[in-house]
Amino acid sequence: MAVTIDPKTFYANPLPGKPFYVRFEVPSDVAEKALEILSIARQTGKIKKGTNETTKAVERGLAKLVLIAEDVDPPEVVAHLPLLCEEKKVPYVYVPSKEKLGKAAGINVAAAAAVVIEAGQAAGELEALVNKINEIRAKHGLNAIPVRR
């Protein structure tokens, strides 16, 4: 059963200098690792790219990791994803650039969001990354989201 979260409280205290939907600061090495895992999963597993496909994968319970770009304009395009991931208990991470996200997803255009559905050869790395994300989330007062198998 999904947990209902009040959007007014969820988005009440945005990080300074970040879009309102960014709930925690992601170090560049963690963001790069997430992009690397997405790229490996694209080649050996299964991914979806774009906000609509990402939303559907989360709602259907297929998502293992959601990647959300921080430089999306307008931000409302992806603003629902962190809240949806929290409700469905899906790990998510922010990456600094939609261009890098698109490239890691194997497309020649920017992508606002992408999702790992099957990690393929990156399964072990994905688990380690989710644990690292949970450490970061704890520093920002957010609960851990377990690795999805």
From Swiss-Prot:
One of its GO terms (molecular function) is structural constituent of ribosome. GO terms for cellular component: cytoplasm; ribonucleoprotein complex; ribosome. Its main location: cytoplasm. Keywords: Cytoplasm, Ribonucleoprotein, Ribosomal protein, RNA-binding, rRNA-binding, tRNA processing. GO terms for biological process: ribosome biogenesis; translation; tRNA 5'-leader removal. The keyword Transmembrane does not apply. It is found in: Cytoplasm. Pfam families: Ribosomal_L7Ae. InterPro entries: eL8/uL1-like, Ribosomal_eL30-like_sf, Ribosomal_eL8-like_CS, Ribosomal_eL8/eL30/eS12/Gad45, Ribosomal_eL8/Nhp2, Ribosomal_eL8_arc. It comes from the Archaea. Gene3D superfamilies: 3.30.1330.30. The keyword DNA repair does not apply. PROSITE patterns: RIBOSOMAL_L7AE (PS01082). Part of the 50S ribosomal subunit. Probably part of the RNase P complex. Belongs to the eukaryotic ribosomal protein eL8 family. Multifunctional RNA-binding protein that recognizes the K-turn motif in ribosomal RNA, the RNA component of RNase P, box H/ACA, box C/D and box C'/D' sRNAs. This is Large ribosomal subunit protein eL8. It comes from Pyrobaculum calidifontis (strain DSM 21063 / JCM 11548 / VA1).
